[in-house]
From Swiss-Prot:
Gene3D superfamilies: HUPs. The record marks 17 as: Transition state stabilizer. GO terms for cellular component: cytoplasm. InterPro entries: Cyt_trans-like, PPAT, Rossmann-like_a/b/a_fold. One of its GO terms (biological process) is coenzyme A biosynthetic process. It comes from Clostridium acetobutylicum (strain ATCC 824 / DSM 792 / JCM 1419 / IAM 19013 / LMG 5710 / NBRC 13948 / NRRL B-527 / VKM B-1787 / 2291 / W). This is Phosphopantetheine adenylyltransferase.
């Protein structure tokens, strides 16, 4: 069974993230969405809230699950019998960053492979940071995040502001 891990902060999960999850679920036997616990980074949503939001939007995918993790990604992958990491790319800038991260992970565990998936064109401008800014300032996020979580993002944006 080929298990892939799709790591990130997902604060919040976007339609771009969901697009990568959907496409990866067709390539791999199992996809684990790994939500990074980063105590140095204050997110809009707590880690538990992010896991809950993701659980709600991945229901249609039988082979996708979500877990939070802290520490090294390669250790999380090893604990989940995975040697494949999925990363979405929107731009050349993403590639530069992801290449360095991929090489470091390869150095830490030579068995880890990174699969880069190009973001679909309609989502190439999306980022969780941009969505938070739009939501905080009262803009429309309807086509930016999954419908199931729009109300959660808008409610949290009011609190965050």
């Amino acid at each position: 069974m080929k298990v892939a891990v799709y790591p990130g902060s997902f604060d919040p999960i976007t339609n771009g993230h969901l697009d990568i999850i959907s496409r990866a679920s067709k390539v791999f036997d199992k996809v684990i969405v790994g939500v990074l616990i980063n105590p140095e980074k204050k997110g809009m949503f707590s880690v538990d809230e992010r896991v809950d939001l993701i659980k709600r939007v991945i229901k249609p995918f039988n082979n996708v699950s979500v877990q939070s993790f802290s520490g090294l990604l390669v250790n999380f992958m090893e604990n989940n019998d995975s040697n494949v990491m999925i990363r979405g790319l929107r731009s050349v800038g993403d590639f530069e960053y992801e290449l360095q991260t991929s090489l470091m992970n390869k150095k830490l565990n030579p068995n880890v492979e990174t699969v880069f998936m190009m973001t679909s064109l309609e989502f190439s401008f999306l980022s969780s940071t941009a969505i938070k800014q739009v939501a905080v300032f009262g803009g429309c996020i309807k086509e930016l995040v999954p419908d199931e979580i729009i109300d959660d993002v808008l409610r949290k944006a009011k609190e965050f502001n």
